Amino acid sequence: VEGDWKTTLYNKNYESIENKNLEYTEQEKSIIAQYSKDNPLHVLCDPTRYPYSYNENGEMKGIIPDYFRKIADYAGISYEFLTPATRDEYIAYQKNKETTDMSIDARLETDNYAETNKWGITAPFITMQLARVTRRDFDGKINVVTTVDQTASNSIEDAMAPGAEKLMCSTRQEMMEAVRKGKADAAFVYYYMAQAFVNSDTTGTMTYTLLEQPTFTYRMVISSTENHALAGILTKAMYAMPQNLVEDLAARYTTYKAAELTFVDWIRLH
């Protein structure tokens, strides 16, 4: 299930941690104290992954920022979100060590990759599964698949719909919208994205199927210019959180009530 805890801790200092409500050491407390209101940690996440993370009127919202706020507040670390409005701005921030202290949605292929870049990494905190979004009248054949123009040479779409024509979209919302409008047969997106879209779709014509594979593990990454002990501090906070926290946070974004639907329709019509 998405959000399942991985019991393996990748932070070397905390290999034996199983219990919750972990106390911080004196050394950790002194590091936490360095990140005061006057010196907050500058935090980055992707603004184009609703409901995982998105920018609403200059404020970062979504499952991942909500989760980070919980653990940072638990640890007593002051933080400030950077507010990129587009994916390009997000990528520019990622490359800028002057402005970005940590990235909270890093998908690392290997632990070595983090070491090479001299990053500190937390334990994984969310495992994302993919879903296939289609119309209800989908016949099982994908002639046209949507994709976002990102650099992956062997994209998910190549693996899931080999030989299908690709329809380029600028966002994942646009990918699902294209399927709804009949311009494409399927979109492959993260599970909660699919759930939020289908649940808010008043036409009733859309559906999604959860895929067992592949899965993607996300962690938080501390910049090479910051104290790497922060990764251990945040990992301790993760292990102190309720087990279903990710699912509970997701439910706020993926379940819709009738009153909210009218607003969603209003957005769609404008």
Where are these regions (language model features)?
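Soluble periplasmic/extracytoplasmic beta-strand elements of cell-envelope proteins
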Residues: 42-44, 131, 221
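Acidic, polar ligand-binding/catalytic clefts
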Residues: 50, 65, 69, 73-74, ...
